[in-house]
Curated annotation (Swiss-Prot):
Name of this chain's protein: Threonylcarbamoyl-AMP synthase
Alphabetical UniProt keywords: ATP-binding, Cytoplasm, Nucleotide-binding, Nucleotidyltransferase, Transferase, tRNA processing
GO biological process: regulation of translational fidelity; tRNA threonylcarbamoyladenosine modification
Cellular component GO terms held in the UniProt record: cytoplasm
Species of origin: Idiomarina loihiensis (strain ATCC BAA-735 / DSM 15497 / L2-TR)
């Protein structure tokens, strides 16, 4: 596994990686590297105004992006009770976070994943990852490493060859502060 992690560390410095999530493969990069984020948006043919999701091994990895102090004490349990799990939350964004991640909004989409391969990857790298489905905009998302290779070829710098979590649909996306549902898991 040490060779695998070494390859992941090398690829994430400036490149795009692919890894399994709860339902599909995700394409990701280091959210702190704007060049890599732009490269990812271009590869996916995804408009920047849509924003991106960040996944993490634990909530502390999301604190550089989430304005934690803007989450009212009475809502904190609701926020944290969703994780780890297959629920992406829309939370207040910290000042200075790239608009490439937020789509220009004052919120950011984040998830503490319970899917162990993705969680282990975030733990090993020591930070959150951008997570967007591994597909060109308008096409079906890849569910295997082979499908990622088929859609993207050499454009992806490293692929974690593990299984997805087996969920039929992508994660639910909600704002727990106002109970707005952006994407249901049904």
């Amino acid at each position: 596994m040490a060779d695998t992690w070494e390859a992941a560390h090398s690829a994430i410095k400036t490149g795009i990686i692919a890894y399994p999530t709860e339902a599909v493969f995700g394409l990701g990069c280091d959210p702190r590297n704007e060049v890599a984020v732009q490269k990812l948006l271009s590869l996916k043919q995804r408009p920047a105004e849509k924003g991106l999701i960040l996944i993490a091994a634990d909530y502390s990895q999301l604190l550089p992006y989430v304005e934690d102090s803007a989450i009212a004490q009475d809502k904190r349990f609701s926020v944290l009770s969703h994780w780890p799990g297959p629920v992406t939350l829309i939370l207040p964004v910290r000042k200075g976070v790239s608009t490439l991640l937020t789509g220009g909004r004052d919120t950011i989409a984040v998830r503490v994943t319970a899917h162990e391969p993705a969680r282990a990857l975030c733990r090993e790298l020591g930070h959150a990852l951008v997570s967007t489905s591994a597909n060109l905009t308008g096409q079906e998302p890849a569910r295997t490493a082979a499908e990622v290779r088929q859609q993207f070829g050499d454009s992806v710098d490293w692929i974690m060859d593990e299984s997805t979590g087996g969920a039929a649909n992508p994660t639910r996306i909600i704002n727990p502060l106002n109970n707005q549902v952006f994407r249901d898991d049904a």
